[in-house]
C-alpha cells in the first residue's frame, strides 16, 4: 500500500470537505479490500460494490445510506458496456490511493492521465510545484499539454497560453545561464521532462541542435542572439521571431537585464564574427542592439568619417537619436554626444567662415553671434563635456579629433574676437545705443513690469554669475521643451541677448544690473559705486534695490536650493543670486570643471525658477553679470600678452593699478601695442580711470590664477549675456511637440514574417517645435496590450531637417506566431504623454492576417 489507513481517512474526508458528495474508488489490485470496512469516516458511509454492482446500485441511488458516500470496487475494471455502475461512476468524483492518482487529484489532472504522472515522480516531491500545477490555467487534457504544464511549473511560469509558457521556460533557462546557474534545467531533468523541453522549444522558438549534437542552453542562447540580428548575421537557418521576443523581454525587464547583458557580452565575439566586415557601418547596423560590439562599430565608423571630414552634423545627431533608446546607449552616450557635438562644432565654424566677412558693424557682429554663431560655443562645451566622461580607450582613439576641434575652435575665437574688437568703438562709446545694454536691464526688464504687469503678480529675477549667452539659450530651450514642470501648467521660455559692461568682471556686472545710476570703479579694490552707494555684497545691493522698489527681497540662491524659498508674499520683486559657473571656473584647481558647472547651473536655475513661479511670480527673468572664455587645452606661451611695466605698477605703492587675466585698470597704464585702452567715459563709466584689454583672446600673466577660464576682456563670449524670460503660457503660445504619421510600405495585410512602415516626423524641431518620443508595434485588435511582434521599437523624433525625406525612419517589425491566432492585427504608433512613461495611440492601421499562403514563400 502507498498510504496507511489514517491517511486514507484524511484524504476521503478532505474530498468531502471540498464539496464532493460521492467518491468512486476503483482499486484494481484489490490491495485495500481488507481494510475498507475498518475505515472510520464519521457520518459518511462506504459501500463495497465488488461482485454486487447491480444490487448495490439500488442502495446507492434509492436508499443512500449517508449524504457523503464512498463507492469502493476492487478487481479489474469492467468494460463500460458491461459496467452496471458506469453512470454512477461518471457522476462521482474519482478517488484513488495510488500516488499518481493522489497527485492527479491534488493537481487537477484527469484520472485517465494519472499513469503519465508516474513517469515524473520527482516533480511531485515539491509542494510548490504541485501547487503550481494545480493552479495553472494551462490545459492538462492530454499527455503533451500535461507535460508542458509541468514544464511551466518547473520554471515558475504563470502563463495562460502554451506558447507563453514555453517563452517563460526559455527565459528562465537563459536567466540561469546568464547568472552562472543551472537550477531550472536540473529540475527539468530530475523531473523527467527534458524530452518534453526541446521539442516545445523547437515548436515555439524554432531552435534545434545541429545534427548529431544534443541541445544545450548555451547553444540556444547563441543562436537566439544571432537571430536577433538576422539582418546582419547570415549564419544557418533563422529562428522564429519569438526568439527575438524572448530576448527583448529579458533586456527590457530590470530584474532580468543583468542576465541578458552577461549573455550578450559572453557571446558578443561569436555573434560579431558572423557579420561581414563591409556591414559594420552605422547604416547597416541601424537600430540593432543585440550585442554591445555593434555600438563599437558605429562609434568607430562615425569617428573615421569625422576625421576624414565626411561626417555631417545632421547625420551624427540623427544617429544619436536613432540609438537613443537602444539597449546599450547609456554605455556609449558620451561617445555619441562627443561625435555629434564635435561634428557640429566643426561644421558651425566652417559656416562662420562663409558669413563673417559680411558683418562689418558692431551691431551686425552682435546680431550674428546672438542668432547663430553662439552655437559653436555650445557645441564646443558639449564636446568637451562628453569627452571628459568618455572611456579611456575612446579618448585615445579620438585624440586626433580633439586636436582638430581645439585647433578650429581656437582659430574661431581669435578671428571672431578680432572682428568684435575692431568695431567695438564704432559708435564712439560702449555699449552702443542700438544694442541692448546691461546698464538698462533693471529699468527695461524690472521697473517697466510694474505696477500692473501680470495682474500685479510679483517678478522674479535670477542672476547667475558667468552664465554666458549660449548657456542661457540652452536653459531656455530645455525649459521650452518641458524640463520645468508646474503640474498641468505649461511653462515657456525665450532667450534674448544683451551686452554686459566692460571690463566684463563680476563687481561691475552685478552693479550694472541694479537700478539706474552713474557707476564709478574703485581702481584699487575693483568695487563699484552706483549713485554713490556701495554695490558689493547682498546687503548693499538690497539697499540699492529697495530704494527703487520698496519691499523687494534679495536672496542667495544657495539658501533657496538648500532650504526652499522663504515667505515672499508681500514682495513685489524677488532677486536670487546664483553662483555655480564662476565659483568653479575662477579657481585654478577647478577651472577644468567649468562646463560641468554650466550643466549644474542650468538644472539649479531651472529649479529656482520653478520655486519662484510657484510662489506667485508672474515672470522669472534669468540673466548674468558677464560671460567667459574657456579653452580646454593648456594655454600656450604665445597666448600670453607680455606688457612691460604692468606688474611693477600694480605692486608699486601709491599706484591705483590692478589687473586680471583679461583687463587692467588704473589712472595710468603702460602703453603697449598688445593692449586696447579706453577711458571711463568711453565705457559709460564715471571717474578718471583708464581700462585696457589684451588684443584677441590673449591673457595677461597673473600669479596663482587659472588661464583656461577667463573673463573681463572684450570678446563676444565674455560680453554677450542672456536675458531668459520664463513664465506660464497658454497652450497656443507654448512650444508644441512635433507630430508623427505612419506609411505602410506594402499592402494592408500580413502574409509573411515582417511588417515594414515609414515613421514620418511631420515638422522639423526648432525652438517652437520640440522632439517627440514614439513607440511602434503590432498588436491584437481585441487586446491592445498583447504584442504580436518580436519587440516594440522606440524612436526619438528630433530631426531639424527641412527635407521631409530626412525626417522619415523605416521600421521593420518581425511578426511572432501569435498573429496566427488573430484574423487581423493593428499596426500602431504611440506617442509619449508629456514627460511620463505612458504612451497614447497616435496613428493606427488595421492589417488582415493571411499567412497560410505567404509563409510558403517567406524566406
Q: Can you say where each PLM-predicted feature lies in the sequence?
A:
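…; additionally, a secondary subgroup of soluble metalloenzymes is captured
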Residues: 1-459, 466-620, 624-859
Amino acid at each position: 500500500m502507498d498510504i496507511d489507513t489514517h491517511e486514507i481517512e484524511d484524504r476521503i474526508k478532505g474530498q468531502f470537505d471540498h464539496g464532493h458528495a460521492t467518491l468512486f474508488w476503483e482499486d484494481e489490485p484489490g490491495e485495500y479490500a481488507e481494510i475498507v470496512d475498518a475505515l472510520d469516516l464519521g457520518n459518511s458511509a462506504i459501500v463495497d460494490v465488488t461482485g454486487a454492482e447491480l444490487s448495490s446500485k439500488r442502495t446507492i441511488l434509492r436508499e443512500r445510506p449517508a449524504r457523503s458516500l464512498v463507492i469502493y470496487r476492487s478487481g479489474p475494471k469492467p468494460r463500460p458496456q458491461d459496467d452496471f455502475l458506469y453512470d454512477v461512476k461518471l457522476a462521482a468524483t474519482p478517488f484513488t490511493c495510488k500516488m499518481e492518482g493522489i497527485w492527479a487529484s491534488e493537481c487537477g489532472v484527469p484520472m485517465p492521465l494519472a499513469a503519465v504522472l508516474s513517469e515524473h515522480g520527482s516533480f511531485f516531491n515539491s509542494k510548490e510545484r504541485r501547487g503550481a500545477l494545480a493552479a495553472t490555467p494551462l490545459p492538462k487534457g492530454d499527455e503533451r499539454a500535461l507535460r508542458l504544464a509541468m514544464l511551466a511549473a518547473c520554471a515558475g511560469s504563470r502563463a495562460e497560453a502554451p506558447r507563453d509558457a514555453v517563452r517563460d521556460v526559455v527565459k528562465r533557462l537563459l536567466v540561469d545561464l546568464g547568472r552562472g546557474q543551472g537550477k531550472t534545467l536540473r529540475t527539468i531533468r530530475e523531473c523527467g521532462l527534458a524530452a518534453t523541453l526541446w521539442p516545445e522549444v523547437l515548436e515555439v522558438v524554432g531552435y534545434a541542435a545541429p545534427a548529431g549534437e544534443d541541445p544545450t542552453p548555451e547553444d540556444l542562447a547563441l543562436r537566439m542572439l544571432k537571430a536577433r540580428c538576422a539582418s546582419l548575421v547570415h549564419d544557418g537557418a533563422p529562428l522564429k521571431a519569438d526568439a527575438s521576443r524572448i530576448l527583448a523581454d529579458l533586456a527590457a525587464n530590470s530584474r532580468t537585464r543583468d542576465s541578458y547583458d552577461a549573455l550578450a557580452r559572453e557571446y558578443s565575439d561569436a555573434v560579431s564574427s558572423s557579420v561581414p566586415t563591409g556591414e559594420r557601418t552605422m547604416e547597416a547596423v541601424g537600430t540593432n542592439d543585440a550585442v554591445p560590439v555593434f555600438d563599437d562599430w558605429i562609434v568607430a565608423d562615425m569617428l573615421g568619417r569625422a576625421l576624414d571630414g565626411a561626417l555631417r552634423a545632421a547625420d551624427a545627431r540623427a544617429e544619436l537619436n536613432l540609438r537613443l533608446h537602444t539597449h546599450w546607449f547609456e554605455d556609449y552616450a558620451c561617445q555619441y554626444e562627443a561625435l555629434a557635438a564635435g561634428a557640429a562644432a566643426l561644421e558651425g565654424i566652417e559656416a562662420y567662415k562663409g558669413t563673417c566677412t559680411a558683418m562689418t558693424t558692431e551691431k551686425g557682429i552682435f546680431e550674428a553671434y546672438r542668432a547663430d554663431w553662439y552655437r559653436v560655443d555650445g557645441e564646443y562645451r558639449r564636446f568637451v563635456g562628453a569627452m571628459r566622461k568618455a572611456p579611456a580607450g575612446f579618448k585615445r582613439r579620438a585624440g586626433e579629433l580633439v586636436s582638430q576641434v581645439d585647433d578650429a575652435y581656437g582659430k574661431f575665437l581669435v578671428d571672431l574676437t578680432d572682428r568684435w574688437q575692431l568695431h567695438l568703438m564704432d559708435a564712439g562709446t560702449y555699449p552702443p545705443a542700438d544694442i541692448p545694454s546691461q546698464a538698462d536691464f533693471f529699468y527695461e526688464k524690472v521697473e517697466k513690469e510694474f505696477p500692473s504687469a501680470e495682474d500685479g503678480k510679483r517678478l522674479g529675477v535670477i542672476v547667475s554669475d558667468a552664465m554666458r549667452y549660449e548657456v542661457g539659450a540652452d536653459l531656455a530651450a530645455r525649459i521650452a521643451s518641458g524640463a520645468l514642470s508646474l503640474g498641468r501648467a505649461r511653462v515657456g521660455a525665450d532667450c534674448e541677448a544683451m551686452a554686459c559692461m566692460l571690463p566684463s568682471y563680476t563687481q561691475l556686472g552685478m552693479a550694472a544690473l541694479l537700478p539706474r545710476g552713474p557707476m564709478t570703479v574703485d581702481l584699487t579694490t575693483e568695487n563699484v559705486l552706483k549713485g554713490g552707494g556701495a554695490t558689493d555684497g547682498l546687503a548693499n545691493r538690497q539697499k540699492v534695490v529697495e530704494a527703487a522698489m520698496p519691499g523687494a527681497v534679495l536672496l542667495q540662491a544657495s539658501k533657496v536650493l538648500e532650504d526652499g524659498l522663504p515667505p515672499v508674499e508681500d514682495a513685489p520683486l524677488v532677486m536670487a543670486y546664483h553662483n555655480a559657473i564662476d565659483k568653479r571656473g575662477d579657481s585654478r584647481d577647478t577651472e577644468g570643471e567649468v562646463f560641468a558647472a554650466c550643466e549644474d547651473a542650468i538644472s539649479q536655475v531651472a529649479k529656482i525658477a520653478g520655486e519662484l513661479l510657484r510662489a506667485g511670480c508672474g515672470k522669472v527673468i534669468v540673466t548674468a553679470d558677464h560671460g567667459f572664455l574657456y579653452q580646454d587645452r593648456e594655454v600656450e606661451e604665445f597666448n600670453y600678452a607680455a606688457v612691460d611695466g604692468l606688474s611693477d605698477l600694480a605692486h608699486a605703492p601709491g599706484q591705483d593699478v590692478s589687473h586680471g587675466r583679461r583687463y587692467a585698470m588704473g589712472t595710468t597704464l603702460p602703453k603697449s601695442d598688445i593692449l586696447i585702452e579706453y577711458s571711463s567715459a568711453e565705457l559709460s563709466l564715471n571717474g578718471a580711470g583708464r581700462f585696457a584689454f589684451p588684443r584677441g583672446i590673449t591673457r595677461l600673466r597673473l600669479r596663482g590664477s587659472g588661464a583656461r577660464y577667463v573673463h573681463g576682456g572684450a570678446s563676444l563670449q565674455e560680453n554677450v549675456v542672456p536675458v531668459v524670460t520664463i513664465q506660464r503660457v497658454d497652450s497656443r503660445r507654448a512650444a508644441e511637440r512635433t507630430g508623427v504619421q505612419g506609411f505602410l510600405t506594402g499592402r494592408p495585410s500580413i502574409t509573411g514574417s515582417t511588417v515594414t512602415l515609414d515613421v514620418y516626423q511631420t515638422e522639423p524641431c526648432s525652438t517652437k517645435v520640440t522632439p517627440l518620443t514614439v513607440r511602434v508595434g503590432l498588436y491584437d485588435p481585441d487586446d491592445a496590450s498583447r504584442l504580436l511582434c518580436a519587440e516594440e521599437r522606440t524612436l526619438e523624433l528630433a530631426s531639424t531637417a527641412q527635407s521631409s525625406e530626412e525626417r522619415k525612419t523605416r521600421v521593420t517589425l518581425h511578426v511572432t506566431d501569435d498573429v496566427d491566432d488573430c484574423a487581423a492585427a493593428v499596426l500602431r504608433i504611440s506617442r509619449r504623454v508629456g514627460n511620463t512613461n505612458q504612451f497614447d495611440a497616435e496613428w493606427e492601421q488595421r492589417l488582415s492576417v493571411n499567412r497560410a499562403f505567404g509563409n510558403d514563400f517567406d524566406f
